[in-house]
A protein has these predicted regions:
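Secretory targeting signatures
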Residues: 1-24
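Flexible "stalk/tail and boundary" regions
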Residues: 23-316
Length: 316
């Protein structure tokens, strides 16, 4: 009998310490039932490549990973294997310098867009960190920003920027010429309280995690309201400060649910699919996960801001 209890105890312990996180899957057709923790980035612990406060994260077509580190005001680039490649940026207001680089996006040409939050501008770079252009000044007018937060690029190269404090989304050409904007502060359709990010799906529809309203809103490419979902809470499809949205190749939508310390996945129409993560500093746990991206192979990278790392997951 004692042997049986020992076997059972060992089995329970193996479940507790497994790196595979079983998720609650309500759509069998989604084929997403669990996510396996792979590793943290960076794995090396040197001052040159240490991440202090990761916020923005994205991947390019070759699988290279770009991380905004607001703790050092620089951008770090890693290979698809997580090996450090290069970094650029420092504190300041000149070209290629930053004051809280919050969001990032890599377009189909490999250009990197950074929302330089406290410099009230967007900067555009080549993939090696070479400065290309910038736009934006402080203010509330067209092409001006108070706190530019998220950035996204559609299939035509148009650039969308969410402005947290102006409570709007602005649309620009690839070189920063203003096209249109929408949004105001409030809780109605098409209104926002701190729009934290902006993302586009394969049809170029626009999605905004409405951080202060604990919901996600969906729009046409020119800002016409389509739908919304989410309420405050801890249940499936509920949020506590949804931060960043990313899409995979199947147009499934991944949302970092910051104060719930988890990631939720939805269809692009807002149907809940699955979730994973809980509060903590262990593998597969999060402390206010800020940003997320999915590469062409379905690998999921989460910028775990307070834990000062990036975590890589694969779906089973």
């Amino acid at each position: 009998m004692q042997f049986v209890f020992i076997v059972i105890a060992l089995f329970v312990l193996s479940l507790m310490f497994s790196s595979t996180y079983v998720t609650e899957d309500v759509l069998s057709s989604s084929s997403l039932s669990s996510f396996t923790f792979v590793k943290k980035i960076p794995q090396e612990d040197t001052s040159e490549i240490q991440i202090f406060e990761p916020e923005g994260i994205d991947v390019d077509s070759e699988g290279n990973i770009y991380v905004n580190d607001i703790g050092t005001n620089r951008i770090l680039k890693f290979s698809k294997n997580g090996t450090y490649v290069l970094s650029w940026g420092s504190t300041g207001s000149g070209n290629g310098k930053f004051n809280h680089p919050h969001g990032n996006e890599v377009d189909s040409q490999g250009n990197v867009y950074i929302t330089d939050q406290d410099n009230q501008r967007v900067q555009k770079f080549k993939s090696n960190g070479t400065f290309i252009t910038k736009w934006g000044t402080p203010g509330t007018g067209n092409g001006q920003f108070m706190h530019p937060h998220g950035v996204a690029v559609d299939s035509k190269g148009n650039v969308f920027v969410s402005d947290r404090d102006n409570a709007n989304i602005q649309k620009f050409t690839t070189d920063g010429k203003f096209i249109t904007k929408w949004g105001s502060e409030g809780s109605g359709d098409g209104q926002f309280i701190q729009p934290w990010d902006v993302a586009v799906d394969s049809d170029d529809n626009v999605y905004v995690p409405d951080y202060g309203n604990n919901r996600t809103q969906k729009f046409t490419n020119n800002g016409e309201f389509i739908a919304k979902w989410g309420t405050e809470g801890e249940g499936n499809g509920q949020f506590k400060q949804p931060a960043v949205i990313a899409f995979d190749s199947a147009d499934r939508m991944y949302v970092t649910d910051s104060e719930n310390h988890r990631v939720q996945i939805f269809s692009k129409n807002g149907t809940f699919i699955t979730k994973w993560g809980n509060e903590g500093s262990g593998d597969g746990q999060f402390l206010k996960p800020e940003s997320i991206t999915v590469d062409s192979l379905g690998h999921v990278y989460v910028a775990d801001t307070v834990n000062n790392n990036v975590q890589l997951f694969i779906s089973n």
